[in-house]
Design a protein with these regions (language model features):
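C-terminal segment of classical bacterial N-terminal signal peptides
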Residues: 16-24
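Hydrophobic helical h-region of N-terminal Sec-dependent signal peptides
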Residues: 9-16
Length: 179
């Protein structure tokens, strides 16, 4: 291999090492004998994925608590166990979009499965939205969903989302007054 190609290859490797996580293949002439493919290249670490999860959940929590504050209601606390139940429900909604679980049980049993001890509970589900903002807007425009978000009895909340093949999400908010 000549020096020019070696330098080019070294530069490409350095760029790939320090490039953003999401990048698209450049539309350039490919040297003879090399192949390329157009598309998205993603190499997210477990830490990056966890950060993404925390980021959208924090955005959802901020949005919920802003609505509650505007209504004069105390803020909710994000709870890991309630969140586990919400994520379970989001995955289930991807299979069967309903407040009844695929096993025929009520959605509240997801809280039981996650080890949550509660005296009050509620669930909001939403399908095909792509952002927290559009999902919250949809819920706030619905009397029943808005009532769950603003219910004074709830003290804890958890969120789940599951992505479908089209890139849209099934979103779940689970609310609880824990014992």
């Amino acid at each position: 291999m000549n020096r020019r190609r070696m330098a080019g290859l070294a530069a490409a490797l350095m760029l790939m090492t320090f490039a953003p996580i999401h990048t698209h293949a450049a539309l350039r002439r490919v040297p003879e004998g090399m192949k390329t493919e157009q598309g998205e290249w993603t190499t997210k670490s477990k830490k990056d994925k966890e950060k993404d999860e925390e980021s959208w959940q924090q955005e959802m929590l901020d949005s919920v608590n802003a609505a509650r504050k505007k209504a004069g209601v105390a803020p909710l606390e994000l709870d890991k166990k309630v969140g586990k139940a919400a994520q379970l429900r989001a995955n289930e909604c991807k299979q069967s979009y309903d407040h009844t679980r695929p096993n025929g049980k009520k959605s509240k049993t997801a809280l039981d499965d996650a080890g949550v001890s509660y005296s009050w509970w509620g669930e909001n589900i939403n399908e095909k939205q792509k952002t927290v903002q559009s999902t919250m807007q949809s819920w706030m425009e619905s009397k029943g969903h808005k009532a769950n978000i603003l219910n004074e009895k709830y003290t804890k909340v958890g969120f789940g989302r599951a992505k479908d093949e089209s890139g849209s999400y099934y979103w779940v908010q689970m609310f609880a007054k824990t014992k």
